[in-house]
Amino acid sequence: MQKTTRTMPTHKNIALVAHDHFKPELLRWVKENKEKLQKHFLYATGTTGSLLSKETGLAIKSMISGPMGGDQQLGALISEGKIDMMIFFWDPLNAVPHDPDVKALLRIASVWNIPVATNRATANFLFNSSLLEEEVIIEIPDYEAYLAERT
């Protein structure tokens, strides 16, 4: 597939997602990183967004709940270039009813080459990177070329 680039802005669009057993862990991480997070635009699946907003006072645009389609809503935003990075504390030891949606969300994040943290250590690495508050050019699929090849 041919590639093109897009520029992530200085103020990133960050998706925050957590499975039920990991919501307390994400909440703790968000509280620890609140000062950095408030410089960015935050999105979340419904239940996670409601919890984080209520407990931290951060402005978060919440989708609907993940199992009801929120994972897919975030995936659509990623494919439109409207999400720059994702912090997704998922539960690798317990199946969830919407496992196919979870896999699709992680797949689409990989397709569109956005940074994804699936645990606290990786989230800390991302948030301690100087790139967090800089414009960053990333390679992404050239959808126009892809379309031209297929039609």
Swiss-Prot record:
Entries under Pfam families matching the protein: MGS (PF02142)
Name recorded for this polypeptide: Methylglyoxal synthase
Catalytic reaction(s) noted: dihydroxyacetone phosphate = methylglyoxal + phosphate
Function noted in UniProt: Catalyzes the formation of methylglyoxal from dihydroxyacetone phosphate.
Domain MGS-like: 6-151
Entry GO CC: cytosol
Family: Belongs to the methylglyoxal synthase family.
UniProt keyword Translocase present: no
Record-linked CDD domains: MGS (cd01422)
Active site: 71
EC number(s) stated in the UniProt entry for this protein: 4.2.3.3
Binding residues for substrate: 19, 23, 45-48, 65-66, 98
